[in-house]
A protein has these predicted regions:
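Generic N-terminal amphipathic, Lys/Arg-enriched alpha-helix
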Residues: 1-23
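N-terminal glycine-rich anion-binding loops that anchor highly charged ligand groups
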Residues: 8-11, 26-51, 65-76
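Alpha/propeptide regions of enzymes that mature by internal proteolysis
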Residues: 38, 91-92, 96-116, 128
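Active-site cofactor/substrate anionic-group-binding motifs, chiefly glycine-
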Residues: 49-102
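Solvent-exposed alpha-helices and their adjacent loops that cap or buttress functional pockets
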Residues: 73-76, 105-107, 132, 155-159, ...
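General beta-strand structural signal in soluble alpha/beta enzymes
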Residues: 83-85, 106, 112-117, 138-142, ...
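Phosphate/diphosphate-binding glycine-rich loops and adjacent basic-rich segments that engage nucleotide
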Residues: 148-184
Length: 184
């Protein structure tokens, strides 16, 4: 039987923050990324938790993820926002946009946001759960480069298209569906 080592969640979060700081990210961005990774681990979504650290480190070293990224609003209306993430940490760009979308939805009743040049966002359930804390329904989805084969195929032809929806309810525990069209 395989034995697992249990690590205190606060120690794990602090370890992740220190790792992101060592890679050159600022404290706020290191905290946001670490919270999203920890959220996934605490819910058994280990594919989107701390095990991603070596991959993120390689992306930073290869220039695919930028510690000094400058997120910019490219276009917006009363209900929509388009941002360029400049290869920031995915959760940092998602958090930036999520806060804008929530405020616009409070102002006009609905809002939509789109991110260009983003990196791995982590578990989408995190973001829709945060939106439900404001009494709103949250929907998140993404497209990407082909990373899975079509039925009967031998090579990648489709994106796994992650999708999540969060619906608030009276019991403080929202209904959250977080899925993709592949197994991770």
């Amino acid at each position: 039987m395989k034995k697992f080592k249990v690590i205190d969640q606060y120690k794990l979060k602090n370890f992740m923050i220190e790792m992101f700081l060592a890679l050159g990210f600022n404290k706020k961005h290191a905290r946001i990324e670490s919270e999203v990774l920890l959220w996934a681990n605490l819910r058994g979504i280990d594919s989107h938790g701390v095990r991603r650290l070596p991959l993120y480190e390689s992306w930073v070293n290869e220039g695919e993820m930028r510690p000094n990224a400058k997120i910019k609003i490219l276009r917006e209306s009363a209900a929509t926002t388009l941002i360029d993430a400049d290869k920031a940490l995915g959760p940092v760009a998602m958090d930036f946009l999520m806060r804008i979308v929530i405020q616009k939805a409070k102002n006009v009743g609905v809002s939509w946001g789109v991110i260009r040049n983003n990196t791995h966002e982590g578990a989408f359930g995190y973001y829709v759960s945060e939106i439900t804390n404001h009494g709103m329904v949250g929907i998140a989805s993404a497209g990407g480069m082909p990373n899975m084969a079509m039925y009967g195929g031998a090579s990648a032809g489709l994106s796994n298209s992650p999708f999540a929806i969060g619906v608030p309810n009276e019991d403080d525990f929202p209904l959250v569906l977080d899925m993709a069209t592949s197994v991770v």
